Amino acid sequence: IRCFITPDVTSQICADGHVCYTKTWCDNFCASRGKRVDLGCAATCPTVKPGVNIKCCSTDNCNPFPTRNRP
């Protein structure tokens, strides 16, 4: 499977059986910069703390960098 990986947001080959993920959360700059984003791959969908959103998927390049709605 191929997944996008941060910080470069490049598509890389991950190990067989892995899933791609997109993890997003707010930090002190959330209002001005938007949510922080972490893209990667893992053997299983990572568990996250409250306030952190995660989406996992299992097709090539299914975790692109999310677009931010501008006012």
Curated annotation (Swiss-Prot):
Which pairs of Cys residues are joined through disulfide bonds in the record? C3-C20, C14-C41, C26-C30, C45-C56, C57-C62
Keywords (A to Z) from UniProt: Acetylcholine receptor inhibiting toxin, Disulfide bond, Ion channel impairing toxin, Neurotoxin, Postsynaptic neurotoxin, Secreted, Toxin
Got a GO cellular component term for this one?
Answer: extracellular region
Source organism, top-level taxon: Eukaryota
**According to its UniProt record, what is one Pfam family this protein matches?**
Toxin_cobra-type
Identify a single GO molecular function assigned to this protein.
ion channel regulator activity
What is the name of this protein?
Long neurotoxin 2
| Lineage, highest ranks first | Eukaryota, Metazoa, Chordata, Craniata, Vertebrata
